[in-house]
Amino acid sequence: MIQMESLVQVADNTGARSAKMIGVIGKRTRQAHIGDIITCHIRESIPTASVKKGTVVKAVVVRTAAPIRRDDGSVLRFDGNAVVIIDKDNNPRGTRIFGPVARELREKKFMKIVSLAPEVL
């Protein structure tokens, strides 16, 4: 679970390093879970990035530090919060994904992100 004003890592190769969550798209709540689409403000990026510092982008949450309870009773939790920047068609803007992603992304129809990820937990 990520709430408003949370700092998150960017887990793709668009050049952005960290972002701040400023809203959840399609929900009235101020909290986002894995697979939710959020709006982010880029806080830090490298100079040659395709996404510059200060821009507002759409992103999907791929990892959260809050525990995720699965239907089989298992609990999954990551070390930090991470997002992948997406375009208007919900495809990732980068060509690589860094780190593992949760299996819940497959149920939410983010197949391109799941296929690019090195590991799906």
Curated annotation (Swiss-Prot):
The record's listing under Gene3D superfamilies reads: Ribosomal protein L14 (2.40.150.20)
Which Gene Ontology terms cover its molecular function?
large ribosomal subunit rRNA binding; structural constituent of ribosome
InterPro entries listed in its UniProt record: Ribosomal_uL14, Ribosomal_uL14_bac-type, Ribosomal_uL14_CS, Ribosomal_uL14_sf
Q: Which domain of life is it from?
A: Bacteria
Cellular component GO terms, alphabetical: cytosolic large ribosomal subunit
The biological process GO terms on file are: translation
Q: Which protein family is it in?
A: Belongs to the universal ribosomal protein uL14 family.
Subunit comment: Part of the 50S ribosomal subunit. Forms a cluster with proteins L3 and L19. In the 70S ribosome, L14 and L19 interact and together make contacts with the 16S rRNA in bridges B5 and B8.
Q: What is this protein called?
A: Large ribosomal subunit protein uL14
Q: What is the lineage of its organism?
A: Bacteria, Pseudomonadati, Verrucomicrobiota, Verrucomicrobiia, Verrucomicrobiales
Name of the encoding gene: rplN
